[in-house]
Amino acid sequence: MNVLTEIKTENLKSFENNPFIFREDTAFEMLIDSISNLGVLTPIIVRSIEDGNYEIISGHRRAEACRRLGIETIPCIVKELTRDEATVILVDLNLQRDEVLPSEKAHAYKMKMDALKNQGARTDLTSTQSVSKFRTAEEVGKENNESRETVRRYIRLTYLIPEILKLVDEGRIAFTPAVELSFLPSEEQHEVYGFYENEEVTPSYSQTVRMKKLYSEGMLTSDKISDIMAEAKANQKDFLKIPTENINKYFKSRFTEKQKQEFVIKAVEHYHRFLMRQRDAG
């Protein structure tokens, strides 16, 4: 049963362990303007929790925009849902967004798999239940037109240390080598990240496959990791590292990494045109 009602913003709580990052971007500023002029046109979706509060399933940005504007109540659709049912809806709705980071998708798929498992869809890794596991992975990807294997590979990213997962989000490490790195223990992953910090190089797919194989054979050492990472790669991208404290004042608050990169590129292009005009004038 669904109930449409007005709920105070102070009683609306963010979804616990929400895998999707809140972005304070241009779209959010436009949302604030829209709500300021027209109000909340689409009710947010919530479920009742303890102490007279409600957990937001869909509409975190609308709720935050209302808080910024000092709007005290928001139209809400209250659904009678368990935590697991709410998780499935949260994931399916948010994965329809235009921009979803690999880390967001990874944690979202894992949350949905766990929710389906709790609802009775077995995802155990035992051989006798492997077929059920595959079917559950297929169900998770069904809403987003992704295969069960793709879903399972995204979930592997949740085994990465945060530093490497951030490199995946930034596009510095590609998806397939990141999946292979996820099979290494955190200590070895920190070794790989340490080499990246010192030398500004990331591993290729073939290098991560070799590291994974060496680890499975009990032969992966710090020296082996350094030797593999030090190999020349024809397709290695060059990155310019700029301390963010030197340029953060020029960014709007809560810019994403992609937005920061685009801003810096536009600034460099603008400055280059300025120098060319000065040269032509002089």
Residues covered by each model-derived region:
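Short, charged/polar connector segments at secondary-structure boundaries
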Residues: 1-79, 85-99
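Short acidic DE-rich linear segments
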Residues: 272-282
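Amphipathic alpha-helical extensions and coiled-coil-like segments
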Residues: 144, 148-265
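Helical mechanochemical/support elements of P-loop NTPase systems and associated helical scaffolds
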Residues: 24-27, 31, 61-62, 87, ...
